Amino acid sequence: MFIKICGITNAQDALDAVECGADALGFVFAESPRKVSVETVREIVKQLPADVLTIGVFRDHVSQDVVNTVREACLVGAQLHGHESAQQVAEVMAEVNWVAKSVVAGSAEASGSNNYGTEMILVDSANPGTGTGYDLSLLAQLPKMINVILSGGLTVVNVAESIRAVSPWGVDVSSGVEFSPGIKDRLKIREFITNARAIG
């Protein structure tokens, strides 16, 4: 089970997440209480093991800006969390090793997500980063043969049940393992990962 801890804002939370077993860390460059600077992310990434997947989260940024930020922050991948077109996704994929496109559960974009050309589709609620969930039955509309990363409203309490319900390729959590926006709770991270791995 692929596990991404998103909304990392400081080195201690990043190191804690990695020590607890996270596969990937997300750094938000879109407007958000968890928004970070390129300089901050670069300093955090320097302290991480080389095998950790580091991902920049963007919303409706120009494709070249995404590519430039990924490079400047020394990241591996990009998560496109806005209204990016298939062409914009392709432009980023041509320059960045790992790219995921986010779609809102139940949306037309979700049902046509195979048109984006990326194997990674992150399914979220309409209000990302708020802890808001959605009806998991909406995932039935997704095209087959796509690696689905489940996000939106996941917590230590419901992650195992959610994985059982839809068998995603991975899970992504932000607010569900926080004290407050941008400040992670190490104990919740550990419990979340333990519960997720117990199923997947």
Where are the model-predicted features located?
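Conserved N-terminal beta1-alpha1 strand-loop-helix module at the mouth
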Residues: M1-G200
